[in-house]
Design a protein with these regions (language model features):
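N-proximal low-complexity "stem/linker" segments adjacent to membrane-targeting elements
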Residues: 1-27
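Short, acidic, metal-binding catalytic loop of nucleotide-sugar glycosyltransferases
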Residues: 26-35
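A conserved acidic beta->alpha catalytic loop
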Residues: 27, 42-51, 73, 95
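Glycine-rich, basic loop-to-helix element that forms the pyrophosphate-binding segment
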Residues: 70-86
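Short aromatic/hydrophobic "clamp" motif used to bind/position activated sugar donors
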Residues: 91
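Flexible acidic/His/Gly-enriched loops in nucleotide-sugar-dependent glycosyltransferase catalytic domains
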Residues: 101-180
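Conserved nucleotide-sugar donor-binding catalytic segment
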Residues: 145-225
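Membrane-interface aromatic/basic loop that binds lipid-linked glycans or pyrophosphate carriers
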Residues: 271-334
């Protein structure tokens, strides 16, 4: 007797995606695997997204399509609603900008093993005139839990939630945090691994996920720059807090990673400051001052970078611009 195919719930949070939602939906409908429910969560879209999604409800499909509307609350709340509504044995997340290969779900199910997370490699497709698309392949097989957590914490392992198939039964009491703007996927994945004592991640060899990136405009707004830094800092600290206390070595790695990753984010955001007013507001921010103070006192930060942090917080506008420009030139020369 043929074994019954497990139902897969595909959760797709959607916000103002009228240009991309159809291709995303079709890539799920056209899967070689049939026992699928597609859960569309409309996060308060204000463009034509709703009409496109509802048209697929009216057309009918070989897969079960469900539609839910919520007042705009962000992707984390939308994903949590999808988790609660899901009826499948397994859950897969797909972003409304992206597409999946037609045999993606079938390959995930075939390779699924108890106590193991199955992951995928992906292709980056950038919405630019430059031919700078990329393929991210992960060949490593993980069989030690702390090695998985270590690589997630320091950023060597992709925490993108759409790369993995999750067991619904094992997701009890694991949700996305609504106040997290950065690394919410990584935080969710770490919780799932710790709660279920996962020791193995196996990656499929072929490319199954198409990750579409659009060019972001230059951030030249103080509130946004400060918010980026504060949100990222908050995310890193939350990850550090969920690592079990007895994992002292991993805790220390997390602390070191926090300092290095926050420093890089600060540099990326500060380098985008192009106006005198923006720099002054950044330098006056008490929250930023506190973060900089902690980084300067951190023994994991190199002395040269500490000087950079001090300089950007205290230098006049012209000196600041010159310093940032010289630093960018030196980086390109390396």
């Amino acid at each position: 007797m043929k074994k019954k195919e497990p139902k897969i719930s595909v959760i797709m949070p959607v916000y103002n995606a009228e240009k991309t939602i159809e291709r995303a939906i079709l890539s799920v409908i056209n899967q070689t695997y049939n026992n699928i429910e597609l859960i569309l969560i409309n996060d308060g879209s204000t463009d034509g997204t709703e009409n496109i999604m509802k048209s697929y409800l009216e057309k009918g499909s070989k897969i079960d399509i469900k539609y839910y509307f919520q007042k705009n609350s962000g992707p984390s709340i939308a994903k949590n609603l999808g988790i609660n509504m899901a009826k499948g044995e397994y859950i897969l997340f797909v972003d409304s900008d992206d597409t999946i290969s037609e045999n993606y779900i079938e390959s995930l199910v075939i390779n699924q093993k108890e106590g193991t997370i199955i992951g995928a490699s992906y292709k980056i497709i950038r919405d630019t005139e430059k031919n700078d698309n990329g393929i991210i392949i992960t060949n490593k097989i993980y069989d030690i839990r702390n090695e998985i957590l270590n690589d997630l914490v320091i950023g060597n392992l992709n925490g993108f939630i759409w790369l993995y198939l999750f067991n619904k039964e094992k997701m009890k009491n694991i949700y996305f945090e609504k106040d997290i703007r950065y690394m919410e996927d990584t935080l969710f994945l770490i919780k799932y691994i710790i709660n279920n004592n996962i020791n193995n991640i196996i990656y499929l060899k072929d490319i199954y996920y198409n990750y579409y990136q659009t060019d972001g405009s230059i951030t030249n707004n103080t509130n946004k720059i400060i918010k980026n830094i504060l949100s990222f800092t908050n995310s890193i600290r939350k990850i550090e807090n969920i690592i079990p206390k007895e994992e002292k070595e991993l805790k220390e790695i997390c602390k070191k990673s926090r300092a290095n990753r926050i420093s890089k984010l600060i540099e990326n955001n500060v380098s985008k400051i192009k106006e005198r007013k923006i720099l002054k507001e950044y330098q006056k921010s008490e929250e930023i001052k506190q973060i900089i103070k902690e980084l300067i006192e951190d023994c994991n930060i190199k002395s040269g970078y500490k000087l950079y942090l001090k300089f950007t917080m205290n230098s006049p506008y012209i000196l600041f611009l010159s310093y940032v420009k010289i630093r960018e030139i030196l980086k390109k020369m390396k």
